[in-house]
Amino acid sequence: MKLAAMIKKMCPSDSELSIPAKNCYRMVILGSSKVGKTAIVSRFLTGRFEDAYTPTIEDFHRKFYSIRGEVYQLDILDTSGNHPFPAMRRLSILTGDVFILVFSLDNRDSFEEVQRLKQQILDTKSCLKNKTKENVDVPLVICGNKGDRDFYREVEQREIEQLVGDDPQRCAYFEISAKKNSSLDQMFRALFAMAKLPSEMSPDLHRKVSVQYCDVLHKKALRNKKLLRAGSGGGGDHGDAFGILAPFARRPSVHSDLMYIREKTSVGSQAKDKERCVIS
């Protein structure tokens, strides 16, 4: 408890950071069990790979960024491959802004699950489209993981291409290896570009800052914003982008998620700079 209090004192709360709603996003990782979802998340957050397998029920992470004079919040939701609660999966999809669908190249069942997941995402998001009367783009990448193994492939390239489609701005495919850290950076860059988010959110394009320096988020952002307004180009390179992994991040409550969805589905409702992220 003392450790938690110390870290809380060192790092401002989400409300103290005052991040505009337009700068808050959620990345959702979906797929069957044992395909490497958690390994991909671990690479994204820490750069490390854990070989031991531990079944995931649902893991929630939060990361803050200071990029080009702006502060961003990215929530990362690592979902269960067993989906014991369909309603929770639907809620995760409704609140997601960008998606990573993962299958194992040596497991056809996991590929067929990704086929179902992609359709479920499109169907679920179409509800928002029908209510808002606006186009709802769904930035989505499909990952064929475990490309480092010498195995017999159970999925043909033709099937993958058919699933992905011919519009790289809506869906892209990457053959990756979380174990070897192969093609992951390219995948994250493509996903953030698809979502029109700063490329510096990719783990290879920003500096990672320890939690005790959390207070520099706004100081650095304000400094860069002043430089940008002055036309000096401050904050324009990746050296001025950095991110902090929030300790003890908690998944927002169901009520908070439902309020967030309600806000998104309200006709003409758009995130404004004065609006703040929903804090559970």
UniProtKB/Swiss-Prot annotation:
<dbReference type="GO" id="GO:0005634">
    <property type="term" value="C:nucleus"/>
</dbReference>
<comment type="similarity">
    <text>Belongs to the small GTPase superfamily. RasD family.</text>
</comment>
<keyword id="KW-0636">Prenylation</keyword>
<keyword id="KW-0472">Membrane</keyword>
<dbReference type="InterPro" id="IPR005225">
    <property type="entry name" value="Small_GTP-bd"/>
</dbReference>
<dbReference type="Pfam" id="PF00071">
    <property type="entry name" value="Ras"/>
</dbReference>
<dbReference type="GO" id="GO:0007263">
    <property type="term" value="P:nitric oxide mediated signal transduction"/>
</dbReference>
<dbReference type="InterPro" id="IPR027417">
    <property type="entry name" value="P-loop_NTPase"/>
</dbReference>
<protein>
    <recommendedName>
        <fullName>Dexamethasone-induced Ras-related protein 1</fullName>
    </recommendedName>
</protein>
<dbReference type="GO" id="GO:0045892">
    <property type="term" value="P:negative regulation of DNA-templated transcription"/>
</dbReference>
<dbReference type="InterPro" id="IPR001806">
    <property type="entry name" value="Small_GTPase"/>
</dbReference>
<keyword id="KW-0702">S-nitrosylation</keyword>
<dbReference type="GO" id="GO:0048471">
    <property type="term" value="C:perinuclear region of cytoplasm"/>
</dbReference>
<feature type="binding site">
    <location>
        <begin position="145"/>
        <end position="148"/>
    </location>
    <ligand>
        <name>GTP</name>
    </ligand>
</feature>
<feature type="binding site">
    <location>
        <begin position="31"/>
        <end position="38"/>
    </location>
    <ligand>
        <name>GTP</name>
    </ligand>
</feature>
<dbReference type="GO" id="GO:0003924">
    <property type="term" value="F:GTPase activity"/>
</dbReference>
<dbReference type="GO" id="GO:0005525">
    <property type="term" value="F:GTP binding"/>
</dbReference>
<keyword id="KW-0488">Methylation</keyword>
<dbReference type="InterPro" id="IPR052236">
    <property type="entry name" value="Small_GTPase_RasD"/>
</dbReference>
<keyword id="KW-0547">Nucleotide-binding</keyword>
<keyword id="KW-0963">Cytoplasm</keyword>
<keyword id="KW-0342">GTP-binding</keyword>
<comment type="subunit">
    <text>Component of a complex, at least composed of APBB1, RASD1/DEXRAS1 and APP. Interacts with APBB1/FE65. Forms a ternary complex with CAPON and NOS1.</text>
</comment>
<feature type="short sequence motif" description="Effector region">
    <location>
        <begin position="53"/>
        <end position="61"/>
    </location>
</feature>
<feature type="lipid moiety-binding region" description="S-farnesyl cysteine">
    <location>
        <position position="277"/>
    </location>
</feature>
<feature type="propeptide" description="Removed in mature form">
    <location>
        <begin position="278"/>
        <end position="280"/>
    </location>
</feature>
<feature type="modified residue" description="S-nitrosocysteine">
    <location>
        <position position="11"/>
    </location>
</feature>
<feature type="binding site">
    <location>
        <begin position="78"/>
        <end position="82"/>
    </location>
    <ligand>
        <name>GTP</name>
    </ligand>
</feature>
<feature type="modified residue" description="Cysteine methyl ester">
    <location>
        <position position="277"/>
    </location>
</feature>
<keyword id="KW-0539">Nucleus</keyword>
<keyword id="KW-0449">Lipoprotein</keyword>
<dbReference type="GO" id="GO:0016529">
    <property type="term" value="C:sarcoplasmic reticulum"/>
</dbReference>
<dbReference type="GO" id="GO:0005886">
    <property type="term" value="C:plasma membrane"/>
</dbReference>
<keyword id="KW-1003">Cell membrane</keyword>
<comment type="function">
    <text>Small GTPase. Negatively regulates the transcription regulation activity of the APBB1/FE65-APP complex via its interaction with APBB1/FE65.</text>
</comment>
